[in-house]
Amino acid sequence: MKAAVMGYGTIGSGVVEVLDINGSSIAKRVGEPVEIKYVLDLRDFPGDPIQDKIVHDYKTIAEDPEVKIVVETMGGVEPAYTFVKAMLEAGKHVTTSNKALVAEKGAELIALAKEKNVNFMFEASVGGGIPILSLIHISEPTRH
């Protein structure tokens, strides 16, 4: 399963790290490997292991049918709202730890997710990386 992370600060880099360190246990849980295909950020990260995954245009993620899960870790209402709304409209599951976004636009984004039959999840980011865990669990059918 392909995923994308929007924002590569403390929480975004933590999400990438959690998937890297715990990739095999997460794969067992969801029934397939979870791979970060893109990391959206304004900055470049020369020498960082994710440098080849950096994109600067959120539409690259929204328009890629392989990406099923998007983790928003940018913070603030804008541009997070515009980006998250585009992901939901594109039929992607989204999770965020962005309290400002959820407080101001949560009801609208929940309704859009329901309309598009995808999940919009929000939870506290206790230790960078936690926001992706529930989404992976919920977005995949139970494996026996």
Tell where the protein language model's regions lie, with residue ranges.
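A short hydrophobic/small-residue beta-strand
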Residues: 93-94
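Residue-level detector of conserved catalytic or cofactor/ligand-binding positions
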Residues: 134-144
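Loop/helix-junction capping segments adjacent to catalytic residues or to phosphate/diphosphate-binding pockets
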Residues: 13, 77-78, 103-104, 129-130
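Structural motif
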Residues: 6, 72-74, 97, 104, ...
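Rossmann-fold NAD(P)-binding glycine/threonine-rich loop
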Residues: 86, 99-126, 133
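Short acidic, glycine/serine/threonine-rich loops at helix termini
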Residues: 16-17, 50-51, 106-109, 131-135
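N-terminal glycine-/serine-/threonine-rich beta1-alpha1-beta2 phosphate-ribose binding loop
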Residues: 1-89
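Generic secondary-structure signature for well-ordered alpha-helical cores
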Residues: 20-24, 114-118, 139
